[in-house]
């Protein structure tokens, strides 16, 4: 929003200006001739500003005529025309209070400072020399300084009178913590805000140093009363801030001050939804800042739930309905804060997202509205066009609020009904007349109201109705009698049959089993109400699917799993599109249904269809994970592990959904799953490295330089070959280049070999530990030198020697698919050189063919389909027998072995074959080098992709990689033919 331009003064306001000039001149004349001369010397711009401010604000006119020296000083110091630096406003108030000896003087000096600062702030706001953010910041800083400096003045005097409060357990002096709530907490005070405060103290105990000890709570209650008295009462000097303490536990009937433990217990046991909403903006504004930070950290779990909390929308909707009823009852439709499309609706939109997602997305845990809107846009919660409209609408409403309040320094947001005040507001807002201003105001209110309804409104409600009655139609209401068993079984069966169910008896039994399950019987009333609202919607959408029986069979276990965490049911009730996606994905894949049932937090991914079916590329994946982890304290391992697991679960779901929908082909599916593993491994290694170095210090290389980390994670098998599937484990090998003869440089040094072994163990621990969100990956380390009996971590030299002198041919075959996934670049480059040297050495081809064939035969005998002699018997192509996509003849492993044989046989003459580790590109390399006929190379590539695609589909159906023997006839025969042509048996 561009700042409103200055407009010509309307005739109706000229009397205000004339009267202000006359009264001001009289006051200056009475003060001194020099004072009048000083005013006469003002530049034209300041004199115009004087007229504008006095035309708009009776309060400023009254203050400056009462104390003309105040405005002259503000003008002479240049403070009217410049922004304050950080701390400058507090410094002025501190100077003013330094001379106060009595509490009366404290109150008087605070009020005079408030009047001075208020005149300056209103002047700069009405003349648009300060933007909205600066005005709110100055007002909030004035409040912060007034509260804290008054407290700092009162506390030592209170201690002198009653003793110093001391913690019962810590034995240390206690200070009060003052929390600023609402607009004060968010640094968004308006021109005539009251201040919402909560007082607290760290722990119980009693005062020391006086004859009669006071309980700590009694001490702080009395101190709080003195602080309120210093700020709130209206005297001949005015007031500082109206103090509202009703946001404390139990409101006006509760104790004025509570201990940290009492506060935590209250919010844990009795905290209400509106109190979560209020706590979003809580900020320590005075007293013990360090203790205050600890208190806010204690209360964070109450405000921000670790799971998605769509119940917050219900709470905000209820609050809004109560506000609407009050607005209607009191005739406050013209209230720009509480009325439709007002300031509160913009705040509700932002806070709805904060309460729902803030427990998992730490970037939303902030107070200022503009910052939250920016984050909502940046994180993809709202489109930029929406956040821009909300920003502009909010600015317009807040400027209007300030114009209203500047008139008389009154806390009101009602549009005036008299022509003079209407003209004042139109002038300040830059409009020629009230009608033009009001038209623009109503435009912004309509836009805000529309966006509010999109986010907050009940999905069953009529968007044109501000207040709903009990006659509204409930989505899925026709299924409510069936769920509540208010119709007989025959009628219920007929309803299901007519809707498309096949086995109506099974469907009714499934619903009955759900109703009688232990999870549901022990549900609280609110959770049961949410379930009863959700099931009819579920049935209404299930019958839209081709196979509603299958949908119900797969989704009801999820419903039972989340029933007691009913916020998830609210999520699906509030988001019909998310429910639709859930049913579609569960119908397509029992694997997805099981994943979501085990980890309901995945429901969040269904909210954004564009994101669900568009998984990010490798750099974006890595950046997103880094951004998530950087918001978590380095010492909070539990949260880091949960964040890693949620990241993996979410992106695995997105890849599976994209594969099912057909938006991702097979090769891209494997690419994404492999990139996901690489991003996770990169961060896991970083976490393990930081932990290990913190405990033992850093190991050294043979040249004396420090390792950083001097360690690589090498991927074999599917992850090495960029062919990960759903649920694949990771074949890993760890290699380092540390000096085995030295120790680490920390306070608790250990030798380098032990350090790297522990580092490897830490990596495995982070990957495999089961948490509430499962594990990241199963890890297989058996491909390391000497297998399970070998060292967990090998030095680069030991690895090279083993591969050169001891490794079996099958280990060299495995090395064909090995590549560095993460770690030190220089160690990775040395590994690649070792790999190239080992794979590219001269080999006897007859011996190589025999060894490759022998290993393949062993695998077929042990792992293939025995009924068909691993696909080689005469019955192997019959529909009644199974075909193992991976292990049977003509399948995946045959193609992999041919590729590995070719790489070992010909890479000495054709080193380009070693550039890639995936089978498809190695086959392309064999074709380009003329080592494999074009037709055969193409056949192998297409067969390989077809097999893997079928295996992926089987995995998503939670089935083994086995299909009927009548499938893939042509591919199997061609693979077997090429196998034989290569001389393999």
Swiss-Prot record:
Superkingdom, natural source: Bacteria
Co-factor requirement: Mg(2+)
Any one Gene Ontology molecular-function term assigned to this protein's record: [glutamate-ammonia-ligase] adenylyltransferase activity
Region Adenylyl removase, residue ranges: 1-460
InterPro entries registered for this protein in UniProt: GlnE, GlnE_rpt_dom, NT_sf, PII_UdlTrfase/GS_AdlTrfase
Annotated keywords: ATP-binding, Magnesium, Multifunctional enzyme, Nucleotide-binding, Nucleotidyltransferase, Transferase
Ranges where the record places region Adenylyl transferase: 476-985
Gene Ontology annotations for the cellular component aspect, listed alphabetically: cytosol
Classification via SUPFAM superfamilies: Nucleotidyltransferase, Nucleotidyltransferase substrate binding subunit/domain
Gene3D superfamilies: 1.20.120.1510, Beta Polymerase, domain 2, Nucleotidyltransferases domain 2
GO BP terms in the entry: regulation of glutamine family amino acid metabolic process
Reactions it catalyzes: [glutamine synthetase]-O(4)-(5'-adenylyl)-L-tyrosine + phosphate = [glutamine synthetase]-L-tyrosine + ADP; [glutamine synthetase]-L-tyrosine + ATP = [glutamine synthetase]-O(4)-(5'-adenylyl)-L-tyrosine + diphosphate
Keyword Nuclease attributed: no
A Pfam entry, by short name: GlnE
EC numbers, comma separated: 2.7.7.89, 2.7.7.42
Residues annotated as transmembrane: none
Listed HAMAP family: GlnE
Entry-linked PANTHER family: BIFUNCTIONAL GLUTAMINE SYNTHETASE ADENYLYLTRANSFERASE_ADENYLYL-REMOVING ENZYME (PTHR30621:SF0), GLUTAMINE SYNTHETASE ADENYLYLTRANSFERASE (PTHR30621)
Primary role: Involved in the regulation of glutamine synthetase GlnA, a key enzyme in the process to assimilate ammonia. When cellular nitrogen levels are high, the C-terminal adenylyl transferase (AT) inactivates GlnA by covalent transfer of an adenylyl group from ATP to specific tyrosine residue of GlnA, thus reducing its activity. Conversely, when nitrogen levels are low, the N-terminal adenylyl removase (AR) activates GlnA by removing the adenylyl group by phosphorolysis, increasing its activity.
NCBIfam families: PRK11072.1 (NF008292)
The family this protein is said to belong to: Belongs to the GlnE family.
Name of the molecule in the record: Bifunctional glutamine synthetase adenylyltransferase/adenylyl-removing enzyme
Gene of this entry: glnE
């Amino acid at each position: 929003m561009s700042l409103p331009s200055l407009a010509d003064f309307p005739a109706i306001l000229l009397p205000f200006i004339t009267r202000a000039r006359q009264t001001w001149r009289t006051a200056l004349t009475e003060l001194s001739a020099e004072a009048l001369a000083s005013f006469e010397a003002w530049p034209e711009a300041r004199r115009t500003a004087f007229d504008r401010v006095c035309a708009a604000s009776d309060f400023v006119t009254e203050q400056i005529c009462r104390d003309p020296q105040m405005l002259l000083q503000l003008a002479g110091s240049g403070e009217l025309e410049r922004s304050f630096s950080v701390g400058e406003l507090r410094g002025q108030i501190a100077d003013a209070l330094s001379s106060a000896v009595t509490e009366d003087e404290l109150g008087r000096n605070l009020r005079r400072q408030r009047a001075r600062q208020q005149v300056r702030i209103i002047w700069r706001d009405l003349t648009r020399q300060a933007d909205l953010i600066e005005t709110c910041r100055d007002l909030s800083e004035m409040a912060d300084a007034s509260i804290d400096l008054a407290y700092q003045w009162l506390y030592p005097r209170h201690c002198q009178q009653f003793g110093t409060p001391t913690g019962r357990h810590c034995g240390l002096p206690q200070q009060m913590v003052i929390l600023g709530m609402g607009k004060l907490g968010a640094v968004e005070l308006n021109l005539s805000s009251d201040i919402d405060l909560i007082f607290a103290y760290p722990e119980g105990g009693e005062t020391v140093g006086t004859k009669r000890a006071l309980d700590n709570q009694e001490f702080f209650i009395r101190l709080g009363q003195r602080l309120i008295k210093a700020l709130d009462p209206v005297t001949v000097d005015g007031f500082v801030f109206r103090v509202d303490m009703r946001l404390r536990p139990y409101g006006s009937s509760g104790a004025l001050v509570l201990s940290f433990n009492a506060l935590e217990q209250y919010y844990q046991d009795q905290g209400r939804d509106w109190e979560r909403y209020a706590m979003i903006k809580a900020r320590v504004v005075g007293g013990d800042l360090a203790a205050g930070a600890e208190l806010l950290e204690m209360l964070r779990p109450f405000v921000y739930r670790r799971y998605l909390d769509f119940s917050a929308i219900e709470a905000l909707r209820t609050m809004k309905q109560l506000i609407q009823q009050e607005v209607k009852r009191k005739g406050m439709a013209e209230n720009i804060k509480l009325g439709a499309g007002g300031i509160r609706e913009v705040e509700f939109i932002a806070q709805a997202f904060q309460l729902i997602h803030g427990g998992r997305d730490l970037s939303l845990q902030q107070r200022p509205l503009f910052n939250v809107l920016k984050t909502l846009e940046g994180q993809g919660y709202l489109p930029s066009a929406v956040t821009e409209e909300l920003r502009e609408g909010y600015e317009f409403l807040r400027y209007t609020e300030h114009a209203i309040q500047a008139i008389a320094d009154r806390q009101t947001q009602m549009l005036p009904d008299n022509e003079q005040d209407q003209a004042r507001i139109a002038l300040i807002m830059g409009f020629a007349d009230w009608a033009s201003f009001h038209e623009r105001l109503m435009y912004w209110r309509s836009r805000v109201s529309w966006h509010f309804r999109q986010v907050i409104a009940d999905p069953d409600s009529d968007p044109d109705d501000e207040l709903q009655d009990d006659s509204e139609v409930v989505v899925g209401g026709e299924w409510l009698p069936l769920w509540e068993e208010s119709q007989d079984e025959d009628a219920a069966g007929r309803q299901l049959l007519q809707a498309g169910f096949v086995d109506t008896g099974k469907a009714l039994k499934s619903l009955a089993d759900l109703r009688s399950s232990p999870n549901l019987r022990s549900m609280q009333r609110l959770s049961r109400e949410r379930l009863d609202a959700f099931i009819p919607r579920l049935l209404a959408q299930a019958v839209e699917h081709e196979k509603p029986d299958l949908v119900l069979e797969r989704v009801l276990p999820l419903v039972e799993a989340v029933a007691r965490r009913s916020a998830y049911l609210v999520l699906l009730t509030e988001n019909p599109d998310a429910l639709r996606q859930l049913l579609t994905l569960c119908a397509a894949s029992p694997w997805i249904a099981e994943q979501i049932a085990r980890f309901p937090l995945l429901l969040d991914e269904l909210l954004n269809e564009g994101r669900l079916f568009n998984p990010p590329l490798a750099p974006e994946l890595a950046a997103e994970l880094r951004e998530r982890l950087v918001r978590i304290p380095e010492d909070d391992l539990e949260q880091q592990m949960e964040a890693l697991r949620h990241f993996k679960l979410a992106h695995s779901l997105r890849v599976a959904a994209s594969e099912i929908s057909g938006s991702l082909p097979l090769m891209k599916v494997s690419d994404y799953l492999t990139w996901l593993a690489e991003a996770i491994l990169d961060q896991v290694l970083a976490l393990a490295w930081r932990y290990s170095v913190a405990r033992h210090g850093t190991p050294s290389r043979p040249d004396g330089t420090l390792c950083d980390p001097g360690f690589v994670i090498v991927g074999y098998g599917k992850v090495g070959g960029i062919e990960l599937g759903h649920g694949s484990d990771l074949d890993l090998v760890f290699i380092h280049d540390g000096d085995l003869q030295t120790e680490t440089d920390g306070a608790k040094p250990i030798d380098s070999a032990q350090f790297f072994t522990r580092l490897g163990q830490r990596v495995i621990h982070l990957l495999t530990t089961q948490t509430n969100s499962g594990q990241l990956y199963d890890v297989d380390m058996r491909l390391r030198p000497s297998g399970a009996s070998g060292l967990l971590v090998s030095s680069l030299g030991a690895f090279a020697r083993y591969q050169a002198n001891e490794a079996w041919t099958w280990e060299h075959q495995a090395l064909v698919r090995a590549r560095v996934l993460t770690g030190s670049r220089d160690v990775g480059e040395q590994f690649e050189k070792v790999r190239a040297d080992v794979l590219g050495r001269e080999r006897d081809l007859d011996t190589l063919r025999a060894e490759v064939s022998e290993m393949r035969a062993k695998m077929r005998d042990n792992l293939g389909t025995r009924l068909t002699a691993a696909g080689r018997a005469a019955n192997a192509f019959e529909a009644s027998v199974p075909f193992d996509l991976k292990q049977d003849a003509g399948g995946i492993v045959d193609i992999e072995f041919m590729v590995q044989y070719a790489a070992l046989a010909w890479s000495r003459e054709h080193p380009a074959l070693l550039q890639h580790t995936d089978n498809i590109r190695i086959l392309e390399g064999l074709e380009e080098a003329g080592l494999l006929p074009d037709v055969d190379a193409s056949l192998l590539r297409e067969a390989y992709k077809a097999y893997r695609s079928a295996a992926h589909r089987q995995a998503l159906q939670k089935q083994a990689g086995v299909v009927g023997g009548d499938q893939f006839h042509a591919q199997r025969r061609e693979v077997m033919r090429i196998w034989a042509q290569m001389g393999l048996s």
